[in-house]
């Protein structure tokens, strides 16, 4: 699930239980969580476990080379991630290279936002142009990066190609959880 606690943090009312219950009603088989803005604290982590989450992905270590999942005190597996599309372009990095080495001996988690894949965003301006009208397909298509400057979609396709060529192992998050649980 991908709860958005930002309205609560802005004082706009609501409560975390209602947000989580609504999501679990819609996605009763969900077993992992990453919050909008990576919002977390001890109470929320315990609440995630209470509603049936097995793992969470709210810990961002940009470009870190030695990722390793670990168990939290509440019984959730924390799976850190080391690359995110909007962070990459916030630093004004080129999408010619993700800045992370892919090899058999490294564990990497890449976070891609679907809207940035669709727009092939190379900067945040593309998203800001459509943010308030994302149901408008014409507007979305007008703001897609189809030029020579590489963007989010391009780097995703490049990573998938590299993984295929190197026969890299890719896993779903539930499989990362199962692998780690079997080691514990």
Task: Annotate each predicted stretch with a short phrase.
Residues 21, 25-29, 42-54, 59-184:
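Terminal accessory/targeting
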């Amino acid at each position: 699930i991908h709860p958005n606690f930002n309205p609560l943090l802005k004082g706009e009312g609501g409560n975390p239980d209602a947000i989580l219950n609504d999501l679990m009603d819609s996605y009763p088989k969900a077993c992992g969580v990453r919050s909008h803005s990576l919002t977390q604290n001890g109470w929320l982590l315990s609440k995630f476990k209470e509603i049936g989450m097995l793992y969470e992905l709210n810990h961002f270590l940009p470009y870190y080379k030695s990722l390793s999942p670990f168990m939290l005190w509440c019984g959730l597996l924390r799976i850190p991630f080391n690359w995110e599309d909007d962070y990459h372009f916030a630093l004004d990095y080129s999408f010619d290279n993700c800045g992370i080495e892919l090899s058999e001996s490294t564990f990497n988690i890449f976070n891609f936002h679907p809207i940035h894949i669709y727009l092939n965003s190379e900067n945040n301006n593309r998203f800001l142009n459509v943010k308030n009208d994302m149901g408008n397909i014409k507007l979305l298509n007008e703001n897609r990066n189809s030029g020579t400057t590489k963007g989010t979609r391009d780097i995703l396709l490049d990573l998938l190609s590299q993984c295929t060529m190197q026969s890299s192992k890719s896993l779903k998050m539930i499989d990362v959880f199962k692998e780690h649980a079997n080691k514990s």
